[in-house]
């Protein structure tokens, strides 16, 4: 089954600290009044232009194995294969905050407002990432809450954890995100730019635990897996 989800822009606003961190301001550092004013203006621009929407498609382990195989360009061994094999439920997703946000960023740059453009870009990036968490919550609620007690749902995306970015093609073929206006270019980059895709895996918290010591981990700049693993105990309690 494939479900479409639509949100209001205000439903997907990221936390200010998260956005400012993307701007290079460390957590715990109080931003200046000017930075706060620019952030507030960026939030207004985001809520005015954002059109957040997503498709969520249930998939079996066997079907996901085919999608994940894609064009055969993945790393020889990846944590995603282990996660999927142990997950109780899987779903593919594609989500976007829409093209109007990116259009507004371009307009701001064209009108010599780089500070607001860069802040809006950070707001939109953080909002797009937040869509994955919202979809995970939706995926949890779609099942019997009693059967999901203590389980954790996390997302994994092409381009990360050994899943080659060309895997987008098989994922898109399965989900059909043209229905929400999301397409791929020849390099497998998504349009609109502020979009996310991947697989949601629901299962006991320990399926998401691994040591990031694969060769491809050396190319990862943010290591968000470490942050997610540190948060697993709290996520398990609320699952």
Model-derived regions, located:
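Structural signal for hydrophobic packing residues in well-ordered secondary-structure cores
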Residues: 43-50, 139, 143, 221-224
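Short cysteine/histidine-rich zinc-coordinating motifs and their immediately flanking basic loops
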Residues: 229-238
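Short terminal or interdomain "cap/linker" segment that borders an active site or interface and mediates
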Residues: 146-226, 239
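Conserved active-site and cofactor/substrate-binding residues in soluble primary-metabolism enzymes
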Residues: 34-37, 41, 126, 130, ...
